[in-house]
């Protein structure tokens, strides 16, 4: 027998594993003992244990050596030792996919399966099913049916679970065992009933009606097994989600009835299912919340944890539904289990009132040092949500966050705090200077490069706009002196932004940048030299274009375009307009941040959605002369209902002088194949349809794509808004649903689709301008135009802002899409690029009286984009 080690030895790992230095060849040599007579059960069981250990440690056994060991092991069936026999069953299962001719043990296993020794029968069933393939299954079908309804629970469960595994390869055979499985489902044994219902569900899961009947039967007659109840609750909730059924459904009634079950496991499963159902109202959640409230006072820690974690999830969407539990949650704040206490606190932060925040913060402070970073992040996220809910409490919450920031913690924890502080600074102008000062202190002793560079970027963006910007320069320049190259480069960029926006500080900034020109690192030197030359010109347009706003292109797209340019040498200079525009700010384009300690491997730049479309369209001969793709619509437009015989979705692709409409078509009729599918389009305005690219064949349920190429208006270039009537034309060929063979002859048919709208937003790509005022000055007023409009149907500033942003398809800058409370005036700042690469900026001043009055001022370097904006708004 193996030496018995106590738990302490096991945890210390000090030589407690007797199999640690096993060699495969030595173990296989030992396996020859299996051929000896008489059989030594104890020794053979020990060798089988070694073989199993090697396999489970990932040791590779060759087919020949595995087969030899397997055949030797079959001789051990001559022994009646129960331990050795069980080890044989385990070895058969593990070696069934390594050794050859494993079916040699079929007769021995069948004998054990039908024998009188109950301890052998269950494991024999499992081992037999492991080595049986679909061709042999019918030979043991009779034995399997008998085993399923066996009076011994272990045998019945083994047969049911094995049947479940066999479903994957022999569904039609196992389906014939349904009657036996139904008989087993009425067993008094909880595991047999659970496994039987599991098998029945997997046989019927593609038949929605049959599954509903199963649940109805369970509702009427009940079950003895709590495990079976839990499974049926999950099945019912899945059915509800798929059907998008109403809460009056019998399925929902069944789940709700399980809240009154005598087993805590079932009650929690039902409550969890109701909470996770999409679109549940507070009223429908009430019974589940009541049950979870009772669990909060349970003496069992596992139940308390489950309850408070689930209530935490409810509080995210329905905080009012959890308010009734606040007293119970407050009692859990002092729970000895810190995980429970943390979840209770974060739930209270989501449901508590403004007056309770100070008290909650004190309670959190008392145990923050005792919980893991993972739970600290949860607390920070809850505080972040609270800041948005109660902006007047930002001072209390900020102080708490700064205290946490000074404490020890990992990268994810510190990043969560920094994210939260930055969001408070952006949302609440009163907290800006306090927040920036504390972040300056943090980077003095910050070990994480990602956080230091992010804070430096924020200081460069927000610092120059404060009342005393010079106080931040010392902190930024300290980074140039004390940090490594990545942080130094970030600090140089931040310094340049101060110089670009503050003429008084410019001489001092130039002195500091001249010192940076002598840096050891290329990146730092290059940045310093570049910024120095730009700032010395003392031109606002240059500052805006090269320092404050920078490039608005996709970083991965730029990298790919430059790589392509170097691979194909050309006398023409690199054209920046050939690079796709960024659909997100530069900071958001970067890959997931990692701590500086992590070793970064070179990564292949992933293609963006627009680049994928660019490649697909370039492969179509008719589109090769269109130039670079300017924009693709963010979401496809559905031109049919999802339940109709043909499902058509359209993606709009905009080029400089053309538009391509991509129609993704799916044929949902299994007795038809469509050929030469096109979508004919009739414009209402001056657009001109140039050609159609058909989808050659559209078999059943296989998506296909056809295209329509349209020229943009030339006579009246401002008439960009247009409605197209669409009709799908195709040739129908009948086909056999079973074989898929189509008829040779077909007939022409057509199908009317929904109208398709083209709006001004399809011609503008949104871009982020970090400093709108600088960008506004950079564009200049040569083509500035201004008009005033009355929005008679709009009654609030928030609605007006939302509609304008959506209609124009431009990016709101400097958080101007957020309308302050109790204001009747607001200025919305929008930035974009018109097709062809022309910057377009819009400043919209809004006044709310009885209705909303809007004064729109547009600027661009070309006249056409300005005219289009004003024409579309009018």
Curated annotation (Swiss-Prot):
GO terms for molecular function: structural molecule activity. It is found in: Cytoplasm; Golgi apparatus membrane; Cytoplasmic vesicle, COPI-coated vesicle membrane. It is linked to Immunodeficiency 128: An autosomal recessive immunologic disorder characterized by persistent bacterial and viral infections manifesting in the first year of life, and defective humoral and cellular immunity. Affected individuals suffer from recurrent respiratory infections, bronchiectasis, and failure to thrive. It comes from Homo sapiens (Human). Signal peptide: none annotated. Residues 609-874 are annotated as: Interaction with ZNF289/ARFGAP2. The keyword Cell inner membrane does not apply. One of its GO terms (biological process) is intracellular protein transport. This is Coatomer subunit gamma-1. Residues 1-21 are annotated as: Disordered. It is a peripheral membrane protein. Belongs to the COPG family. It holds the Pfam family Coatomer_g_Cpla. Oligomeric complex that consists of at least the alpha, beta, beta', gamma, delta, epsilon and zeta subunits. Interacts with ZNF289/ARFGAP2 through its C-terminal appendage domain. Interacts with EGFR upon EGF treatment; interaction is essential for regulation of EGF-dependent nuclear transport of EGFR by retrograde trafficking from the Golgi to the ER. The coatomer interacts with KDEL receptors; the interaction is important for retrograde trafficking of KDEL-bearing proteins from the Golgi to the endoplasmic reticulum. Interacts with COPB1. Interacts with TMED10 (via C-terminus).
């Amino acid at each position: 027998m193996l030496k018995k080690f106590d738990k302490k030895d096991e945890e210390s790992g000090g030589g407690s594993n007797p199999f640690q230095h096993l060699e495969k060849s030595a173990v296989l040599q030992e396996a020859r003992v299996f051929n000896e007579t008489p059989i030594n059960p104890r020794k053979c069981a020990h060798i089988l244990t070694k073989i199993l250990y090697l396999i489970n440690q990932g040791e590779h056994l060759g087919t020949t050596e595995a087969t030899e060991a397997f055949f030797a092991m079959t001789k051990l069936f001559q022994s009646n030792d129960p331990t050795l026999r069980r080890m044989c069953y385990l070895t058969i299962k593990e070696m069934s996919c390594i050794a050859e001719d494993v079916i040699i043990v079929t007769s021995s296993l069948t004998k054990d399966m039908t024998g009188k020794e109950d301890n052998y029968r269950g494991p024999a069933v499992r081992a037999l099913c492991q080595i049986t393939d679909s061709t042999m299954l019918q030979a043991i079908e009779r034995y399997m049916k008998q085993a399923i309804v066996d009076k011994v629970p272990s045998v019945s469960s083994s047969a049911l679970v094995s049947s479940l595994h066999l479903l994957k390869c022999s569904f039609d055979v196992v389906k014939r065992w349904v009657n036996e499985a139904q008989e087993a489902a009425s067993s008094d044994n909880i595991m047999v009933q659970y496994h039987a219902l599991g098998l029945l569900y997997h046989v019927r899961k593609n038949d929605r009606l049959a599954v509903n009947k199963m649940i109805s039967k369970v509702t009427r007659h009940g079950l003895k097994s709590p495990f079976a109840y839990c499974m049926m609750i999950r099945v019912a909730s899945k059915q509800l989600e798929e059907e998008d059924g109403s809460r009056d459904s019998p399925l929902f009634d069944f789940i709700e009835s399980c809240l009154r079950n005598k087993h805590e496991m079932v009650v929690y499963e039902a409550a969890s299912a109701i909470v996770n159902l999409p679109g549940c109202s507070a009223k429908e959640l009430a019974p589940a919340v009541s049950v979870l409230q009772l669990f909060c006072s349970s003496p069992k820690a596992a139940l308390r944890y489950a309850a408070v974690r689930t209530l935490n999830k409810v509080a995210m969407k329905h905080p009012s539904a959890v308010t009734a539990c606040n007293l119970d949650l407050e009692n859990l704040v002092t729970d000895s289990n810190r995980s429970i206490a943390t979840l209770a606190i974060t739930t209270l932060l989501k449901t508590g009132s403004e007056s309770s925040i100070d008290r909650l913060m004190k309670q959190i402070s008392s145990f923050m040092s005792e919980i893991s970073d993972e739970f600290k992040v949860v607390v920070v996220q809850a505080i972040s949500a609270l800041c948005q809910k109660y902006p007047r409490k930002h001072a209390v919450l900020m102080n708490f966050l700064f205290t946490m920031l000074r404490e020890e913690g990992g990268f994810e924890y510190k990043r969560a705090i920094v994210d939260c502080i930055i969001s408070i600074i952006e949302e609440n102008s009163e907290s800006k200077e306090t927040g920036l000062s504390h972040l300056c202190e943090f980077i003095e002793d910050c070990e994480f490069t990602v956080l230091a560079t992010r804070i430096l970027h924020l200081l460069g963006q927000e610092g120059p706009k404060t009342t005393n910007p010079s106080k931040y320069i010392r902190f930024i320049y300290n980074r140039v002196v004390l940090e490594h190259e990545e942080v130094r480069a970030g600090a140089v960029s931040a310094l340049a932004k101060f110089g670009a926006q503050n003429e008084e500080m410019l001489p001092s900034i130039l002195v500091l940048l001249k010192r940076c020109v002598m840096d050891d690192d290329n990146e730092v030197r290059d940045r310093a030299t570049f910024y120095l030359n730009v700032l010395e010109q003392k031109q606002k347009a240059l500052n805006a274009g090269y320092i404050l706003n920078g490039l608005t292109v996709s970083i991965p797209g730029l990298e790919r375009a430059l790589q392509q340019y170097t691979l194909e040498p050309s006398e023409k200079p690199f054209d920046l307009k050939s690079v796709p525009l960024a659909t997100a700010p530069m900071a958001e384009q970067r890959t997931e941040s990692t701590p500086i300690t992590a070793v970064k491997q070179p990564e292949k730049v992933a293609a963006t959605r627009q680049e994928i479309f660019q490649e697909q369209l370039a492969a179509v001969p008719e589109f090769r002369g269109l130039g670079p793709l300017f924009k693709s619509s963010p979401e496809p437009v559905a031109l049919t209902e999802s339940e109709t015989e043909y499902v058509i979705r359209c993606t709009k692709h905009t080029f400089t002088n053309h538009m391509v409409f991509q129609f993704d078509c799916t044929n949902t009729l299994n007795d038809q194949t469509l050929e030469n599918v096109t979508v004919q389009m009739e414009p209402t305005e001056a657009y001109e349809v140039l050609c159609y690219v058909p989808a050659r064949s559209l078999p059943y349920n296989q998506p296909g794509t056809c295209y329509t190429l349209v020229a943009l208006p030339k006579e009246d270039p401002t008439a960009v808004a247009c409605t197209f009537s669409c009709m799908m034309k195709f040739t129908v060929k009948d086909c056999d649903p079973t074989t898929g063979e189509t008829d040779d002859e077909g007939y022409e048919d057509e199908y009317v689709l929904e109208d398709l709208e083209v709006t001004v937003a399809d011609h503008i790509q949104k871009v982020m301008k970090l400093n709108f005022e600088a960008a506004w000055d950079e564009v200049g007023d040569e083509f500035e135009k201004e008009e005033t409009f009355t929005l008679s149907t709009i009654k609030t500033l928030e609605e007006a802002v939302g509609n304008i942003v959506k209609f124009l398809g431009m990016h709101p800058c400097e958080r101007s899409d957020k309308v302050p409370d109790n204001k009747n005036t607001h200025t919305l700042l929008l930035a974009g690029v018109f097709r062809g690469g022309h910057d377009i900026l819009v400043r919209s001043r809004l006044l709310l009286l009885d209705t909303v009055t809007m004064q729109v001022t547009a600027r661009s370097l070309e006249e056409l984009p300005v005219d289009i904006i004003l024409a579309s708004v009018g």
